[in-house]
């Protein structure tokens, strides 16, 4: 049987699509189950992160990512783009942030951090606006940035091979609107982050943090430690959904010891 060029091209495309699907199926940015519950709409799996988009707020309900010794990188550009995997009506575009910094003193804040993950193959997706929220400059450049730095430094330890994080916004009061868009959207009033190391939080090496949008720039991130229970109650999500119920209950009601490895004092 002879194959013409069109048939060969089609076969190549089908093979590439299947290979891509197989690769995505092997990605696990959560390790012990991604969050469940809440107002979930669309989930997207990438090497850089897994996120759950909310078409009402226009921002992710949560973003999960996995830092290894190979994922950090520097010198990457910040080229903001609309997420091509989403309906444009369900997310924001770069122009929607016009005037936001001057009017609201907000930055385009990464949920999955660029510096920690720029070494992955699809690093450019870190600059998709599905992974971005309007985060107050004082928070983004202050306590949040210092927490991200300490999170990334964990991977430098010989006894740590992986850092798993899930992060997201809270909407508990009105924070105004972006002046550059007519799209309906909701600016977060707070942000949370849950971190554990290696393969499971079950050995007590985990941490949970919650920051108000108006956190002062000089604030110590260690002062914003909370339990996973508190984050679940305020978000409506179930974190670490793949763990047995009794293990979840035991861990989530108390703070973990991971902050001690991140420079926090008891």
Swiss-Prot record:
It catalyses: Endonucleolytic cleavage to 5'-phosphomononucleotide and 5'-phosphooligonucleotide end-products. It comes from the Bacteria. Keywords: Disulfide bond, Endonuclease, Hydrolase, Magnesium, Metal-binding, Nuclease, Secreted, Signal. It is an enzyme of class 3 (hydrolase). Its cofactor is Mg(2+). GO terms for cellular component: extracellular region. The active site is at 110 (proton acceptor). It is found in: Secreted. Belongs to the DNA/RNA non-specific endonuclease family. The active site contains 1 hydrated magnesium ion that has only 1 direct interaction with the protein; all other interactions are via water molecules. This is Nuclease. It comes from Serratia marcescens. The lineage of its organism: Bacteria, Pseudomonadati, Pseudomonadota, Gammaproteobacteria, Enterobacterales. The gene is nucA.
């Amino acid at each position: 049987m002879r194959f013409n060029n069109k048939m060969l091209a089609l076969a190549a495309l089908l093979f590439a699509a299947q290979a891509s699907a197989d690769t995505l199926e092997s990605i696990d940015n959560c390790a012990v189950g991604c969050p469940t519950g809440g107002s979930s709409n669309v989930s997207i799996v990438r090497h850089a992160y897994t996120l759950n988009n909310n078409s009402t707020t226009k921002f992710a309900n949560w973003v999960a990512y996995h830092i290894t010794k190979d994922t950090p990188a520097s010198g990457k550009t910040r080229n903001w783009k609309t997420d091509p995997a989403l309906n444009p009506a369900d997310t924001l575009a770069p122009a929607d942030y016009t005037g936001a910094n001057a009017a609201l003193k907000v930055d385009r804040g990464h949920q999955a951090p660029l510096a920690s993950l720029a070494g992955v193959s699809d690093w450019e997706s870190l600059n998709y606006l599905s992974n971005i929220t309007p985060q107050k400059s004082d928070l983004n450049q202050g306590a949040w940035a210092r927490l991200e730095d300490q999170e990334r430094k964990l991977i430098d330890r010989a006894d740590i091979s992986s850092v798993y994080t899930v992060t997201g916004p809270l909407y508990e009061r009105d924070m105004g609107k972006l002046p550059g868009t007519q799209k309906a959207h909701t600016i977060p009033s707070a942000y949370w982050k849950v971190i554990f190391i290696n393969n499971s939080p079950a050995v007590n090496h985990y941490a949970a943090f919650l920051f108000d949008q108006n956190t002062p720039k000089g604030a110590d991130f260690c002062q914003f430690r909370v339990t996973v229970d508190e984050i679940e109650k305020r978000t409506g999500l179930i974190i670490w959904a793949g763990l047995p119920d009794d293990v979840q209950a035991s861990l989530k009601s108390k703070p973990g010891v991971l902050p001690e490895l991140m420079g926090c004092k008891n």
